[in-house]
Amino acid sequence: MSNNAESWNQPNVVSFFDTNRTTTSDIYPSEWFFLKEQLKEGMSILDIGCAQGGFAGMIAEHLNDFTYTGVDISEEMISKAKEKYPQHNFHIVKENDYSKVTGKYDVSLVLGILHLHESWRNTIQIAWNHTKSSLILDLREIFEETVEDKNKSYFTMDINGSNEDYSEVLPYNLINSGEALEIVNSICTGAEKISYYGYSQDPAKTAVTPTNKIFASVYLVQKG
């Protein structure tokens, strides 16, 4: 059984999100590429893996009227999110239990987490089930064979400084690019259009991987 919730509750990790990933300038170009075109007044957004709800703050820079629901496995992150954005909805969920997520949203976001947990396919399925229109997700891709073995590719929790007292690691999933598209297409049944954008970059600084270059790839999956 994974210990991912405890990993994201680590003080050094929580403190990183106190001041990062809260404004448009903080998000990656790959994330903004599709999201900026989806923003519309009055829209509803589901953010899976919301951390401290930073996307609520970012979206508020561009929209006056929207509803935002964020879910995360970290109790510490959700507590901070509720303090920062009391006007929005936040829920703690278990990694394989999204029963607190109800209804459908104009846009579902799953950004920055799929490559860092084992049940990422199920997470895509949940996000797709709960969108009325569009799903935006990102993966870390390679042209070589897929690596989903935590013994070969993993992510340490040395975010915002080292954490010598905590030895647990997360998977750092590297998905073959051709296989990734097949997976997204097979999960998102009934999709009318799948758009893709990505670029080459170094792996995360806290990751240990068998490759020195990956693709940060974002998918926009749209219903008819």
Predicted stretch roles:
Residues 1-39, 43-51, 136-162:
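Conserved class I S-adenosyl-L-methionine
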Residues 52-97:
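Class I SAM-dependent methyltransferase SAM/SAH-binding core
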Residues 107-119:
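A short SAM/SAH-binding and catalytic strip from SAM-dependent methyltransferases
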Residues 121-134:
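A short glycine-rich, Lys/Arg-flanked "PGG" loop and its adjoining helix->strand segment in the class I
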Residues 169-189:
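Short alpha-helix
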Residues 190-202:
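Conserved S-adenosyl-L-methionine
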